[in-house]
Structure formats: C-alpha cells, structure tokens
C-alpha cells in the first residue's frame, strides 16, 4: 500500500547462496530466495536497487525531480558514447528513447551543418560546432522540452573549458517553463570541474550523475 503513494526503494543483501548463508549466520533467521523476493518487489511496485551507489542515485532523483507524465526520454549528448550509454540505460530500466516530432527534427536539422542528422539521441556536437556551447545547450533543451512526445530529458555534457559558463543558470529557466518535465544531467570530465557544475546544478534541484 505504501508503494502506491510514496516510492519505496530497497537494497537487499544476501542475493547469492553464499550471501544468504552469511545473512542467516548473522541474524539467525532464514533468508528469502532472491527470485521470490524480486518477484514480490515487482508485484508491489517496490524499486529494488543493486548497490549503495544505485540507492543514493535513485533517492536523489526522487528528492529533486517531479514525477514525469510518462516514460518517453529525449537524450541530448555532446559525446557519442555518452548518448549510446544513456540509450542503453533507458532500455534497461524500461524507458523509451522516443521518436521526436517532425517539427522538432526540422528545427534541429535547420541548425546543423550539412553532415549532421537530427534524431534521438540528439547529437549536440554538430550543433556545438555550428552555434557554440551555450547556444547548443539552449537550442537542444528548448526543442526537446517543447516536444509533446517528450516526458523527460537526459543531458550528457563533457567538462571542457568551453562549458565554463553557468550551466545551472541556463537550465533553471527551462525548469521554470517546464516544471512537469524532469531534467537529469550527466557530466563526464575532470573532478574539479564536474564538482563545480554539480554543486550549482543540485542547488537548483537538478540531479547530476
């Protein structure tokens, strides 16, 4: 009953046979078969995580983000590998990398160089080469968030000197305009720069991974 009104996240130790024996010797009680426990979680709509890092990530998302209207994701990535990994993660967790509307594709294509192709994931690197770092983020976010086929956005950035502007300030405007559409940011790069962006983004309620 709790899971219908408030998200319930569980991290269970003792998944393997060895782990179950260790749990039994520690608590003196029998451990539940992991497949049975997994089935119970799915039936009760309980979110099961695999490790402490995933637990923190999931709880952070619930703490910062609104519940999206659906599972349709637009991925905006400044690195090909980052976009592909985001698409893989969406597939793994039941999210749909949605087909963007024709209007959105046309809008993106008009700002791309001749060799660029609009799609989802949105490859923002060609946009960056054409219009610059800040404008490429703004244009991509605006196009994705205005699309009725998009419920949430995953933005994958690379920490480089060209991104040394206040990304949080830019994104905060979109949060105000589209409060019902969650925005999640992933940053790849040097720790010092990543930490700086992370602090500013999470201050405005945008989780960074």
Annotated model-derived regions:
Residues 161-162:
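Short glycine-rich, flexible loops that bind phosphorylated cofactors or substrates
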Residues 138, 166-172:
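Charged helix-capping and loop-helix junction motifs
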Residues 20, 69-158:
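Short glycine-cluster motifs
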Residues 10-98, 170-209:
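Peripheral docking tails and interdomain loops at the edges
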Residues 2-4:
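Short amphipathic alpha-helices and their capping/turn segments at secondary-structure boundaries
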